[in-house]
Amino acid sequence: MNKKTIWITGGSTGIGKALAIKFASKGWNVAVSARREELLNELSNTYENISAFPLDVTDKLKCNEVFNQIINKFQSIDICFFSTGTWNPKKEKDIDIEQMEDVFKINFFGTVNSIKAVEKYFRDKKDGIITIVSSIAGYRGLPNSTGYGP
């Protein structure tokens, strides 16, 4: 029987890292992506089932490239867990538009880029799971988050 494979973005820290370790401990192939290559390499050197695929999700072409690298290595992907995100709270008087644009590029468009990289594959396969970690800010404003939320 073939091992199942999960692709996790935002896998160098936090929820993504914890999930990568959990799935690796259950015997899954874990493809972990994030910008910080040194943290990914630390994970892949520590856990046999974890493989590092460095990625900046704001780069559409790179998302597709990494997806193809994962397929080439493992022959399939069963679950995608997209947990890439950033947050930099600021009071309204201190908002930096460029910084806000970066938050949207990573949190929103990065997730869209990741989904677009796998959607045709899952449709053709007629199987697969995409899970997205989101922010409560989509439901309720947070302190010092004037530019991000409802």
Where are the predicted features?
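Conserved glycine-rich cofactor-binding loop
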Residues: 10-13
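Conserved glycine-rich Rossmann-like NAD(P)H-binding loop of the short-chain dehydrogenase/reductase
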Residues: 26-43
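Substrate-binding pocket helix/loop in short-chain dehydrogenase/reductase
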Residues: 91-92, 96-104
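Active-site loop immediately N-terminal to the catalytic Tyr-X3-Lys motif
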Residues: 93, 140-149
